[in-house]
Amino acid sequence: RIGKEIALTYRDLGWNIIIHYNSSKKDAEELAQNINSKNPGTAKIVQANLDIDSEVKRLVEESKNFFDSIDILVNNASTFYPTPIDEISDDHWMKLVGSNLKGPLFLISGLKDKLKESKGSIVNITDTNLSKGTANFSIYSAAKGGLESITKGLARELATDITVNARAPGAM
């Protein structure tokens, strides 16, 4: 999975890494163990549901306290499942928009001062299929499309202090 590969790349560069997970605790613990076995004390894990405001705030605060600086924020967490138009619900909307759009935006907002201090970077992971659309994934696509728009706006708004980009990898 892409988040793991990103973390391992940063491990190889000797960076400190905060690994966020929602429900994949075992995977997060194994990744942290892998990173810490090569670079002791450089990986921390934090559980948070990006759909819940208080958990996003806690993730921000814990992240600020782990290390002296934050050099990069990679918004890779995502919820992805089909929502055919005849089956959409408020719950689908809240989950898909929460993890794919709202969570990343509020993480950026909460961590921007630490990122400014280090002249850091933000990378938002989007989706290659946004321009053509994907049947049955309209809510997910709307959320990821919103994240692309936020990325463009914040790239201009924060340009003097923080580099903001989006990357849209293909299927993994």
Regions found by a protein language model. Give the residues of each.
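Canonical Rossmann dinucleotide-binding motif of NAD(H)/NADP(H)-dependent dehydrogenases/reductases
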Residues: R1-I18
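Conserved glycine-rich Rossmann-like NAD(P)H-binding loop of the short-chain dehydrogenase/reductase
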Residues: W15-E30
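Conserved NAD(P)H cofactor-binding loop of Rossmann-fold oxidoreductase domains
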Residues: N76-Y81
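Substrate-binding pocket helix/loop in short-chain dehydrogenase/reductase
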Residues: P84-I85, H92-V97
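Active-site loop immediately N-terminal to the catalytic Tyr-X3-Lys motif
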Residues: D86, K132-S138
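Active-site helix of classical SDR
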Residues: I108, A143, T151
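Alpha-helical segment proximal to the catalytic Tyr-Lys
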Residues: D113, R156-T160
